[in-house]
Regions:
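Flexible, glycine-rich phosphate/dinucleotide-binding loops
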Residues: 46-47, 103
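Short hydrophobic/aromatic beta-strand micro-patches
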Residues: 9, 54-56
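Surface-exposed interaction/gating patches
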Residues: 1-19, 28-29, 37, 99-107
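Short beta-strand micro-motifs enriched in acidic
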Residues: 42-43
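Short, solvent-exposed beta-strand edge segments and adjacent coil->beta transition regions
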Residues: 3-5, 48-52
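Solvent-exposed, flexible loop/coil residues
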Residues: 52, 92-93, 101, 106
Length: 107
């Protein structure tokens, strides 16, 4: 099992609009291909303009296959275009992580 930890910085003051756009246009196609996220969070303290999503995959090949299918989905491409035009996101980072043997998530 791997966990894809994706961190996005949102323009100050644009978090509500970013969450609304994703909920209306991005959530359905993304979860259709990747399954539900382990978590979809936004910070309440510190760098408050930050979103973090966690997606679980069997392995790197599973992640690559599912993400390729998502990228080929016209509905996801429409969301990406709208997100780019809106310009709410400043940057993104991702890390592939492996849970410790004692982590409370199923491996």
């Amino acid at each position: 099992m791997i966990v894809d930890v994706r961190t996005y910085r949102v323009r100050p003051g644009k978090m509500p609009q970013e969450l609304d756009l994703y909920a209306k246009r991005g959530l359905a196609p993304q979860t259709r291909h990747l399954g539900p996220p382990l978590a979809y969070l936004h910070r309440e303290s510190g760098d408050i303009n930050t979103l973090v999503h966690l997606w679980v995959f069997e392995d790197a090949a599973d992640r690559a296959s599912k993400r390729a299918a998502m990228m080929a989905d016209p509905e996801w491409q429409t969301y990406l275009k709208l997100a780019d035009e809106a310009g709410f996101l400043v940057d993104q980072r991702n890390s592939l992580m492996v849970p410790a043997s004692f982590a409370p998530i199923k491996r």
